[in-house]
């Protein structure tokens, strides 16, 4: 329970530092790989859900199971979309994929467009906004494991969630 907020924050910070936002290449090349990004997101979500399941609060446990269910539904579609684009571009490096797509040096642009649409829908589902959100659900079910956190741990987990959404 105590390791989740620092781990969640570290993963979100690592992903933020590894994405090529202002440069053509990833500042930290190891973190610019699509496989590393997806497995890091899966690791963070797993520990987030495990934090809820580990607590003695029934609502946090149900929220943790809900997070795992969302992970099972969302992450395969994100992986499939990224792998489809990586297969067309010939690399799993995010910067290389971006350069191939921007220059038009791809063999199947329709496949990349469809993969981009699928990835955008999966990212929107990951955010948990309407219509994929349960607005009528109890706050404990939506937030899940955060019901057990307080103080600096809650602030760190909320900051990591905000970083992941951006």
For the regions a protein language model found, what residue spans apply to each?
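Alpha-helical transmembrane segments of multi-pass membrane proteins predominantly involved
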Residues: 1-166
């Amino acid at each position: 329970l105590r390791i989740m907020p620092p781990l969640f924050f570290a993963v979100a910070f690592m992903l933020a530092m590894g994405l090529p936002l202002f440069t053509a290449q990833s500042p930290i090349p190891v973190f610019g790989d699509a496989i590393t990004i997806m497995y890091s997101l899966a690791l963070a979500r797993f520990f987030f859900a495990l934090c809820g399941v580990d607590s003695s609060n029934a609502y946090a446990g149900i929220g943790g199971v809900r997070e795992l269910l969302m992970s099972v539904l969302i992450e395969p579609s994100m992986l499939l979309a990224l792998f489809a684009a990586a297969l067309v571009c010939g690399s799993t490096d995010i910067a290389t994929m971006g350069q191939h797509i921007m220059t038009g040096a791809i063999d199947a642009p329709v496949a990349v467009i469809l993969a981009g649409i699928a990835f955008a829908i999966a990212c929107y589902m990951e955010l948990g906004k309407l219509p994929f959100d349960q607005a009528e659900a109890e706050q404990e079910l939506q937030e899940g494991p955060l019901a057990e956190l307080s103080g600096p741990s809650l602030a760190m987990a909320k900051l990591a969630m905000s970083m992941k959404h951006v």
